[in-house]
Amino acid sequence: MQTHSDNRQIPQATCLIIEDSPLDQQMMTRVIGRSQGKMQIRVACTLQSARATLLAHDISLILLDNNLPDGIGANFVLELAADQRLASIPVILVSDWPTPFMWEKAASAGVRYVVNKAEFGVRYVEQALGQGIRRAVHAS
């Protein structure tokens, strides 16, 4: 009996961290490192560099700060949602001060979670990657 093995490599998932604070970049990188599925990490400090990264690479998950030097993360998620190629990428909006206005934009753009940076952890990453439908989740 002859057997065949599939030697094709499964592409490794890649997380794009869009955050201008080096300290918060490190925190998010540590959280990704503790998740069950190991991922490559790419970091963008601005929305402009995030756009370039999204054009050049396949991204599996986006961790997005709301206040960036060249724009607002909550507005950027609307841009992502309008792009058919990018709309299916799970997004977690990680902010110092989530506001009701941010929740509204996040929900309309299909963001998985809006999380305070102090509360952000592995469970959000694993749940976002495990969900098949993009949706915003928040406490009522």
Regions of interest found by a model, annotated:
Residues 19:
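Conserved acidic carboxylate
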